[in-house]
Regions:
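Acidic/glycine-rich phosphate/pyrophosphate-binding loops and surrounding catalytic core
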Residues: 106-178
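Active-site mouth loops of central-metabolism enzymes
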Residues: 26-38, 159-178, 227-239, 284-293, ...
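Alpha-helix-loop-beta-strand connector modules within alpha/beta enzyme cores
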Residues: 52-53, 57, 67-68, 203-231, ...
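Catalytic alpha/beta core domains of metabolic enzymes, predominantly
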Residues: 242-245, 250-372, 385, 389
């Protein structure tokens, strides 16, 4: 007898599987067929589950019951969302994937939970990802995290301010160092290259880094405060690791990589014993995926792979992309207890200015880094005054003024 719905996939529930050895992906599905009041969601769910595990579009003899029992994903949750539209069916679906299928291989895990499944429905989003304990043990996570960065910067309780070097590219190494020196004088805690700059023809990493660090040290001799500089090293994986080593040899006390380098490359970089400085993950490349993968999922994966700090969307941004709840949930995922994995510093960002300090800190709390480019450098009294205005705004909020 042929069953319409495979028992190996559907005769399951969350309470009955070995959660320690599974990854559980939660999806939002929404389908609409005009004039069709019957939508077979379970057939769609079955296709999603098999696509991320054992499935082929045509049954083959090697695809046995034993193979599916051991390797296929299992539907452990189906929660239909009521709709007044008879032609719409929406649900939150949970699929459990066995870790044995790919071990601690992050690219393969991402392929399973967020690969061809997106071809099966116009409205499908990966909303959460539960990582089983046996898989979690195999990841180091951030080396520094919130506590390590606080110790490095000397800022133990309040939010940190960060100067984004602007314009994105085009400046010489000397101009870059000069700009950093001015914001360091104003008390900025950190600075970073723009994500678009790595090795421009007129401003390579090896050219600017020594000049920037020299300027930071010059200011530190006067103020007693040494700014952390996150130097951009995004490149091909092996080149990026070599570049990171070179940057540290040249005095870098922080590194910046982008999501476009890949989660595997991020993990390789952050877990390498030679990399003894914090690593920031820039999330701009994630915007291309935000309609299909929720930001908290991406934040969780980046924390898992070792990001010490990571940009966080906020509705107060000049380019708001998410709701308040989605932005805050992204921050919570970075800070919530998670076994041995250290906390990742959230960085609510994009077009923020000192006048937003109260609402940003009120919503996100003190464990944040606030990056500002034009919102610091655009001060009418200059770059130093812009950095000072951020320090004053943060101090006022923390004092309850």
């Amino acid at each position: 007898m042929k069953r319409y719905y495979d028992p190996e996939i559907f005769l399951q529930m969350l309470d009955g599987i070995d959660l320690d050895n599974h990854v559980v992906a939660s999806y939002y599905l929404r389908d609409r067929l005009e004039g069709q009041k019957f939508l077979d969601h379970l057939s769609l769910v079955q296709a999603l589950g098999l696509e991320g595990s054992t499935g082929t579009w045509e049954k083959v003899e090697e695809d046995t019951e034993a193979v599916r029992q051991a390797m296929s994903s299992k539907m452990v949750g189906y929660h239909e969302i009521p709709s007044d539209d008879p032609y719409v069916k929406s649900a939150v679906v949970q699929l459990a994937f066995p870790i044995r299928a790919w071990g601690d291989n992050v690219p393969m895990m991402l392929l399973a939970v967020a690969g061809n499944c997106f071809a099966y429905s116009k409205r499908i989003m990966l909303t959460d990802l539960f990582i089983g304990k046996e898989l979690l043990k195999k990841f180091q996570g951030p080396k520094f995290g919130v506590d390590g960065i606080r110790k490095l910067s000397g800022v133990m309780e309040r939010p940190l301010s960060l100067h984004i070097i602007k314009p994105k590219m085009g400046m010489t190494p000397e101009q870059t160092a000069h700009q950093v020196g001015l914001t360091a004088q104003g008390g900025a805690d950190m600075c970073k290259d723009d994500e678009m700059l790595a090795d421009a023809y007129n401003n390579t990493m090896e050219q600017r880094l020594p000049l920037v660090m020299r300027e930071i040290d010059r200011v530190a001799q006067k103020t007693g405060k040494r700014m952390v500089y996150l130097c951009s090293i995004t490149d091909e994986p092996q080149k990026m690791l070599d570049k990171a080593r070179r940057a540290i040899d040249l005095g870098a006390n922080g590194l910046l990589v982008t999501y476009s380098a890949g989660l595997g490359a991020l993990r390789e970089l952050t877990s390498h014993p030679d990399i003894n400085v914090p690593v920031m993950l820039h999330a701009s490349h994630m915007i291309a995926m935000m309609k299909q993968i929720a930001w908290p999922v991406l934040a969780k994966l980046c924390r898992l792979c070792g990001a010490d700090m990571m940009l966080t969307p906020t509705m107060w941004s000049s380019i708001p992309m998410v709701s308040m709840e989605e932005g805050l949930r992204t921050s919570f995922v970075k800070l919530a207890p998670w076994g041995h994995i250290k906390r990742t510093f959230p960085m609510p960002c994009a077009g923020v200015y000192p006048g937003l300090a109260e609402v940003i800190i009120g919503e996100y709390g003190p464990d944040i880094i606030i990056p500002a480019g034009g919102g610091m450098l655009g001060h009418p009294d200059g770059y130093t005054a812009g950095a000072q205005s951020w320090q004053q705004a943060i101090a006022a909020v923390m004092a309850g003024v």
